[in-house]
Amino acid sequence: MSMPLSFTSAVSPVAAIPTPRAAAETRTAASLRHAGKSGPVASPSQNTLNAQNLLNTLVGDISAAAPTAAAAPGVTRGQQSQEGDYALALLAKDVYSLNGQGAAGFNRLSDSALLGFGIDPASLHDAGSGFQAGIYSNDKQYVLAFAGTNDWRDWLSNVRQATGYDDVQYNQAVAAAKSAKAAFGDALVIAGHSLGGGLAATAALATGTVAVTFNAAGVSDYTLNRLGIDPAAAKKDAEAGGIRRYSEQYDMLTSTQESTSLIPDAIGHNITLANNDTLTGIDDWRPSKHLDRSLTAHGIDKVISSMAEQKPWEAKANA
């Protein structure tokens, strides 16, 4: 696998989202400018100044209490779970919706913002193939997230790629990652769930980018070879910390991939999330109950719930 590359963007970054304090100050300045057009502005009284100072203080307190981009932990290479991985799980869920706006301090880049970075918004969504992705930013880090399996076209992508055939969604994922890498360099992280996890792993290996995946689809050696990637070297680097892959206990996809050599395993260092859905009594003898549990375990909502409860990034969990 190639070493991570560093690029310097030649375009202007997305304008920072104004804080409540900045917005209040902007509105005050605009009011004064407007008043200046219609006549001289009288000096504000001491009461007015006191009221404005109080307003600014209150706005500042509200801003400080709210989650900020600076408070969101960055995601870096490594085998151990990181707190920022939880934010990526939330984004891996958000990207399933075309109207998703982001989560955990990350905002989804608008079409105009993407164009400003030289990225074609149309390259992130293809109704024909089922491909769907989004790019998010907290002004410090950028996340390229891929949606997973949500219709029959995605299942076809799973089967084609796993059995060694060329698949358009994987090609689109690599192309999107190359564009994002050129724009954001080492500030880019890639994430995805299910099929999206397989896309994320492939895109990460093709661009030398850190990735975090959730209940990810496996990536075949045929796919890696086709992209000019040495499978053995890529898997070794991913296991060493290039890719962290979270798998929920009882997840049907992970269990199936690891129980047969006919389909590939997910790539990366595995972090297992314990599943607290215990089957007892007669339920433990009913295949339908086990199937229901494995299907639920595969969903991104269950992954998010387990991460929130277990906090695997804490030191005692990583010891």
Swiss-Prot record:
Keywords: Hydrolase, Lipid degradation, Lipid metabolism, Signal. It catalyses: a 1,2-diacyl-sn-glycero-3-phosphocholine + H2O = a 2-acyl-sn-glycero-3-phosphocholine + a fatty acid + H(+). It comes from the Bacteria. GO terms for biological process: lipid catabolic process. Residues 1-24 form the signal peptide. Changing residue 228 to D: Loss of ability to bind PhlB. GO terms for molecular function: phospholipase A1 activity. Its EC number is 3.1.1.32. The keyword Ribosomal protein does not apply. The keyword Cell membrane does not apply. This is Extracellular phospholipase A1. The gene is phlA.
